[in-house]
Amino acid sequence: MGRKRKHSETEAPAPVKKSDEPAPDRPKRTLLGWKDKSEGEAEKAKALTSSGFKNKEKVLVTCSRRISFRYRSLMLNIVSLLPHCKKDSKVEAKSSKGATLNELIELKNSNSCLFFECRKHKDLYMWMVKSPNGPSVKFLVKAVHAMEEMKLTGNHLKGSRPLLTFSSNFDKDAHWKLLKEMLTQVFGIPKEHRKSKPYHDHVFVFSIVDEHIWFRNYQISVPHNESDKIAKGGLDKMTLIEVGPRFCLNPIKIFAGSFGGPTLYENPLYVSPNQIRALEKRNKAGKFAKKIKAKTRKKMHELSNPLEPDEFADMWKDDE
């Protein structure tokens, strides 16, 4: 057996001095491995410098009850064109619809609304609203043609971002400038939206004709083979093919608030469909009254101008 070591022979270890400096930070771990701290700081700095205005537009699209199938198909076409919109169930079109829709917009976390209101199964009105502070516009929708009934040859990818074009008439008056800005915010798809595609292959055209806003949707068609590459400025080779839908907007009133408030603009040329139908009824009633008057005049003329008796009328009665 070995000899036991004496306590005097063992030397005590020297005490280690602890540094007051904090431990180095551990690098961030990602799916691709450990991430260096300098890289993370560089990305944060880049995000801070690039962060500016970010478009977070969300549009709520809904309609009133008892809407006709034709107008409903138009609404569904618009929903398919706007990937940043949210479709909701029907809302009762009562006098308190403004408060109901404002609450619904807030619940859906939206800041714009397109509300299609159908009356008498004939007339379609569209509210375009910025919530909660306004403004809001009420349109009469005319000349409605949905995609299903036209069957046009144009086709573009669902969810792609459109180019918005406006006629030069939008810059002549203040109310047209306001409508142009609202149409840009509602129909313009935000960049890098999660449901949108990051390229443009169709055009939304808004043009003013006879104080009405006419809407058209065209596909940008570029005929080329796999080997051919079109230059950025080669617009002469691009063609436009209509996709649909088609509709016409007649502005009625512009309000300062959401679904109401002080009137900013009222269209002096607007005639309601009820007045047009009343005039048509009066014209029809006038035609019937003219017929009755013509019959009475004919009878009075016959009574005032009787026919002379014919001397040969009873000539052959004696032979019988």
From Swiss-Prot:
Gene3D superfamilies assigned: Probable brix-domain ribosomal biogenesis protein
Stored SUPFAM superfamilies: Class II aaRS ABD-related
GO biological process terms on file: ribosomal large subunit assembly; rRNA processing
Compositionally biased intervals (Acidic residues): 308-320
Source organism superkingdom: Eukaryota
Keywords: Nucleus, Ribosome biogenesis, rRNA processing
Biased composition (Basic and acidic residues): 17-40
Chain positions covered by the region annotation Disordered: 1-40, 297-320
Recorded GO MF terms: rRNA binding
Residue ranges annotated for the Brix domain, each copy included: 57-260
Reported tissue expression: Expressed in roots, rosette leaves, stems, flowers, siliques and seeds.
Assigned GO CC terms: nucleolus
Changes seen on gene knockout: Delayed growth rate.
Subcellular location: Nucleus, Nucleolus
Described purpose of this protein according to its UniProt entry: Involved in pre-rRNA processing and required for biogenesis of the large (60S) ribosomal subunit. Required for proper development.
Family: Belongs to the BRX1 family.
PANTHER family named among the record's database cross-references: RIBOSOME BIOGENESIS PROTEIN BRIX (PTHR13634), RIBOSOME BIOGENESIS PROTEIN BRX1 HOMOLOG 2 (PTHR13634:SF3)
Protein name: Ribosome biogenesis protein BRX1 homolog 2
Organism: Arabidopsis thaliana (Mouse-ear cress)
